[in-house]
């Protein structure tokens, strides 16, 4: 499935209901908003969620044209992260093996029932995940008791193409922010010709109810100062609700200092050079009491989190990568 198809496969009925709510808030008719969506789609290739999340109904044409949508991601990532090398990242067991020095936890992808039983004995709390997936779908936290017999779990893994990994015990300071989920930092890097740099970083925090911090699974995001490792401003969820403090813990976001930030930066800058063909990666970094670890690497990271938090389009991120590629390869890629 192409990303553009993915963007527009959403529920049109739900989009219409969302427009009805927005109509009252903005004082515009549903017809006016929908025709505006069609205009924005023609100009940018945006999907339903893009239109709402980025408040396209409020943007000038100049502002609109700076937003990265699914359309731009498809084009850009074929240059910066070609599909020919995707399984290095997208098949999650491959990722765990390829970046084993950075993941900091046990995982089980293949073996015998007896080996699975031994794994479960060593890991009384596990995460069960699909071999591939987007936006945190299909991820579940499970105790040893909930997992049932090793034989039954083994058969389920084989049938549904699942793998399991040991649950990450997160750093005490991060746990203070939200203990219901493992809260991660999304760091996008550009690795090219033996050099790497950080393009942006933001924190993702669970809502205190779900076991997942993903923006698409009820989590929220907060801007992060790359130099200091401090959060700044407010947190925002996908419904654009704003939070000065975490709704469950009451901890203030602005000024919250991440532990092991320098170590985290070094880790992702090193990891960015592991595969010389994949230049742009969105790393999900967790913190334990011993330091940072990689949860996963996304070969084609989305722009929704950074653009919602920035409240503006971020084509500048893509342009900075294309400038380096053009200079080195004599190409003339433009966005």
Predicted region positions:
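Short, surface-exposed beta-strand-loop junctions and turns on beta-sheet-rich folds
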Residues: 134, 205, 300-302
């Amino acid at each position: 499935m192409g990303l553009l198809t993915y963007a527009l496969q959403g529920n049109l009925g739900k989009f219409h209901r969302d427009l009805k709510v927005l109509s009252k808030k903005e004082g515009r008719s549903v017809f006016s908003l929908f025709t505006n969506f069609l205009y924005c789609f023609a100009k940018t290739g945006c999907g339903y969620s893009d239109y709402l999340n980025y408040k396209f109904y409020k943007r000038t044409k100049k502002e609109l044209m700076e937003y990265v949508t699914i359309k731009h991601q498809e084009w850009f990532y074929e240059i910066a992260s070609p599909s020919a090398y995707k399984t290095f990242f997208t098949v999650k067991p491959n990722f765990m093996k390829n970046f084993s020095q950075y993941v900091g936890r046990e995982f089980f992808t293949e073996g015998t029932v007896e080996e699975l039983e031994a794994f479960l004995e060593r890991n009384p709390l596990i995460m069960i995940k699909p071999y591939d997936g987007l936006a945190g779908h299909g991820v579940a936290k499970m105790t040893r008791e909930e997992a049932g017999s090793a034989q039954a779990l083994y058969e389920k893994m084989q049938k549904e193409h699942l793998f399991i990994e040991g649950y990450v015990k997160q750093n005490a300071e991060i746990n203070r922010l939200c203990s219901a989920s493992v809260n991660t930092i999304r760091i996008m890097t550009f690795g090219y010709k033996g050099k790497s740099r950080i393009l942006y970083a933001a924190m993702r925090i669970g809502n205190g109810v779900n076991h997942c911090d993903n923006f698409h699974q009820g989590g929220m995001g907060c801007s992060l100062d790359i130099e200091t490792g401090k959060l700044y401003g407010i947190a925002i969820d996908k419904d654009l609700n704003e939070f000065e403090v975490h709704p469950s813990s009451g901890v203030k976001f602005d000024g919250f200092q991440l532990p092991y930030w320098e170590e985290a930066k070094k880790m992702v800058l090193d990891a960015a050079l592991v595969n010389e063909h994949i230049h742009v990666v969105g790393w999900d970094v967790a913190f334990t009491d011993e330091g940072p670890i990689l949860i996963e690497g996304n070969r084609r990271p989305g722009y929704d989190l950074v653009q919602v938090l920035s409240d503006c389009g971020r084509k500048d991120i893509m342009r900075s990568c294309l400038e380096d590629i053009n200079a080195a390869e004599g190409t003339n890629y433009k966005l």
